[in-house]
Amino acid sequence: MAATAYEHLKLHITPEKFYVEACDDGADDVLIIDRVSTEVTLAVKKDVPPSAVTRPIYGIMGTIHLVAGNYLVVITKKMKVGEFFNHVIWKATDFDVLSYKKTMLHLTDIQLQDNKTFLAMLNHVLSTDGFYFSTTYDLTHTLQRLSNTSPEFQEMSLLERADQRFVWNGHLLRELSAQPEVHRFALPVLHGFITMHSCSINGKYFDWILISRRSCFRAGVRYYVRGIDSEGHAANFVETEQIVHYSGNRASFVQTRGSIPVFWSQRPNLKYKPDPQINKVANHMDGFQRHFDSQVIIYGKQVIINLVNHKGSEKPLEQTFAKMVSSLGSGMIRYIAFDFHKECKNMRWDRLSILLDQVAEMQDELSYFLVDSAGKVVTNQEGVFRSNCMDCLDRTNVIQSLLARRSLQAQLQRLGVLHVGQKLEEQDEFEKIYKNAWADNANACAKQYAGTGALKTDFTRTGKRTQLGLVMDGFNSLLRYYKNNFSDGFRQDSIDLFLGNYSVDELDSHSPLSVPRDWKFLALPIIMVVAFSMCIICLLMAGDTWTETLAYVLFWGVASIGTFFIILYNGKDFVDAPRLVQKEKID
């Protein structure tokens, strides 16, 4: 089977069936989905009834089962990102969710409401920016992984050969993946970030590409998914690959990021920064070893760069991570702790050079992947930098962009694009492209995990910290606080539904969506607002004597402040918590 998927498709809809027609040159296949039996079959174009309503689509994301029955999810708009070794890369920008059922009359009012909520969850994930695909190229693998494949692998369909860590519609495609004959209709979709630029230095033109692949294992939102699971999958795991294509030569440099790989949590509780909790009873070494065993198999040597604070609430996590590495005693793993905030305080961001100098020799040892124009592998990357902070976002992005630039400097010199002694940061035009692309990558990763753009991107874009950047960081921090406390439960549920961590059972009489709120949820905020309002009224409408006014103000002031602290104490009752999948509670 050719390792391509159909690019041009038409969707024909009748009351009984969906017909997905392949319109590529020479194609005669039609995928038929029975809207009643849900059976999937393959036919030819002459089987499409002329009475069907027809529209163009650009790919099938898959199918999902909700309360009302099955739904077909299709890509309705796409945008060209660029060309990758003569393969077109697309970004999916709009989707449609089509019900198999013609009416909802078979549902009760409660089922209708639940179905509406599940649809909103599905659409929430689909509206998240960052879904990419190609009908001819396997985006889920790095250049180095693709170079080490067998002829049998290259004959597989894109879906079969894809790295399942990065196929975000894997659950939606489960029915199609069970039938190899329809795999050309099944499109593996990546979630993350891709940017491509044609660049020029010294009159030499090359393509520069940046790809971030988000893992769909232990996926979720900032405060609800931390650490690792029992299988060793780390939260917010992202593989970032930087690629250069010059005169037939291809070079790539891969880095990873992922949450501190022990069992810990940091549940929102209305505090600006909840204290992280390390599980006191879990077997940390078991999960830790599983995580790094798989990382070493996939990537080789691991150089861990831990950027968390060495004091305060982050200190126990740094100590635990260091202890785990020491206890494991693997020659394949090296550990570097760099207190980012301490080293760079008072906007001394030039001090990041201390870390770069510290790891320079290790980076040269890890090298990068390079294949020449004849297809011969010149060098392999022997391992990766695995960077992390608390969120694996802001501090991590800064460090990754600096490490990637150092690798790129070496690659471009080796390829003859840069002259001996020339520095990449002196190439103003390219530097602007480079910094903006890495800042855009930072924003994409941050929005997908934390719900807002990244912090510290002014440094990534300009090379220095600015006052405007500090103001924007403040705004994004406040926005994160709101989302993390009051909307992330819904976001987490949406991701769990999309990835199949939760399956809808319409026969289940107890809906997880209808969780009754405790009396405190409504009563305490109302009491606080009333008390605060009365305090203001007493200030504006003075009593007969100043002592009387003071007494009223003190009474209502103490009532409002007291209620505020009671709300804060019971913070976990007021946040928007996930309802579908109960993660391990680590308190």
From Swiss-Prot:
Tissue expression profile of the protein: Detected in spleen, lung, liver, skeletal muscle, kidney, testis and in cerebellar Purkinje cells (at protein level). Ubiquitous. Highly expressed in brain, spleen, liver and kidney.
Reaction equation(s) it catalyzes: a 1,2-diacyl-sn-glycero-3-phospho-(1D-myo-inositol-3-phosphate) + H2O = a 1,2-diacyl-sn-glycero-3-phospho-(1D-myo-inositol) + phosphate; a 1,2-diacyl-sn-glycero-3-phospho-(1D-myo-inositol 4-phosphate) + H2O = a 1,2-diacyl-sn-glycero-3-phospho-(1D-myo-inositol) + phosphate
Localization (cell): Endoplasmic reticulum membrane; Golgi apparatus membrane
Pfam families assigned to the protein according to its UniProt record, in alphabetical order: Syja_N
EC number(s) on file: 3.1.3.64
Regions of this protein lying in the Lumenal compartment: 542-548
PROSITE patterns per record: SAC
N6-acetyllysine modifications at: 456
Chain spans, region Essential for phosphatidylinositol-4-phosphate phosphatase activity: 452-587
GO biological process, one term: exocytic insertion of neurotransmitter receptor to postsynaptic membrane
Superkingdom to which the source organism belongs: Eukaryota
InterPro entries for the chain: SAC_dom (IPR002013)
Molecular function via GO: phosphatase activity; phosphatidylinositol-3,5-bisphosphate phosphatase activity; phosphatidylinositol-3-phosphate phosphatase activity; phosphatidylinositol-4-phosphate phosphatase activity
Signal sequence segment: none
Quaternary context: Interacts with TMEM39A. Interacts with SEC23A and SEC24A; this interaction is reduced in the absence of TMEM39A. Interacts with PLEKHA3 and VAPA and/or VAPB to form a ternary complex.
Function: Phosphoinositide phosphatase which catalyzes the hydrolysis of phosphatidylinositol 4-phosphate (PtdIns(4)P), phosphatidylinositol 3-phosphate (PtdIns(3)P) and has low activity towards phosphatidylinositol-3,5-bisphosphate (PtdIns(3,5)P2). Shows a very robust PtdIns(4)P phosphatase activity when it binds PtdIns(4)P in a 'cis' configuration in the cellular environment, with much less activity seen when it binds PtdIns(4)P in 'trans' configuration. PtdIns(4)P phosphatase activity (when it binds PtdIns(4)P in 'trans' configuration) is enhanced in the presence of PLEKHA3.
Name of protein: Phosphatidylinositol-3-phosphatase SAC1
Organism: Rattus norvegicus
Gene: Sacm1l
